[in-house]
Amino acid sequence: MKKHLNFYITLWIVKLISAGLKLLGKNATYYPGKLALDMCPGFMGMLDKPKTIIGVTGTNGKTTVSNMINDILIDNGYKIINNKYGSNIDAGIATTLLQGATLFGKSKKEIAVLEIDERSAPKVFPYITPTYLICTNIFRDSLMRNAHTEFISEIVSKNVPKDTIVIENADDLICSGIAPNNAKIYFSI
């Protein structure tokens, strides 16, 4: 997406607010991204992304898996951006990308490891194409929120970008069936 003046104004305001929140001892994992998306709806699409993006989604284990991947990559010398505090909806992901960007929206990191809430796929994947998307599992979670496992798998399947390589839990039949037309790698426990 082409960057315009509103993008830069938004970027500078939310970077300033994010720095202020951190000075006050806050993690600033949600609000800066929420404000950025309110001020500039295409904000996530305009930010430059790291060359490699690893997304982690599923009902359980997203934070653990994304933090393990993050730690392994850091231990091997990579420059990483990660939403390690679990702010995994669109605003949290926008905040994470913002924190890894310069004042001109260029990425300062080589790799992004992003925990992505499965219900946020329609709001995230139009702007971010993960190189890899790991699906840990898909279980019936909160009935009020997720209704049924097939409902969740359909949301993820319909929104995974076609160029994303999907890494799926082969022990979970529902998880191993998402994004049927994408390249796949399977793992088992």
Regions found by a protein language model. Give the residues of each.
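Loop/turn-to-beta-strand initiation segments
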Residues: 105-112
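Acidic, Mg2+-coordinating active-site environments of NTP-dependent enzymes
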Residues: 51, 108, 139-189
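General beta-strand structural signal in soluble alpha/beta enzymes
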Residues: 80-84, 114, 167-169, 186-187
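A conserved segment at the C-terminal end of the G1
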Residues: 52, 56, 64-84
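Conserved glycine(s) of the Walker
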Residues: 61
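Short acidic loop-to-helix transition motifs that present clustered carboxylates
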Residues: 87-92, 116-121, 151, 173-174
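Short, basic phosphate-binding NTP loop
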Residues: 1-55, 75-76, 91-101
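Extended acidic/charged loop-beta regions that coordinate divalent cations
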Residues: 112-141, 178-189
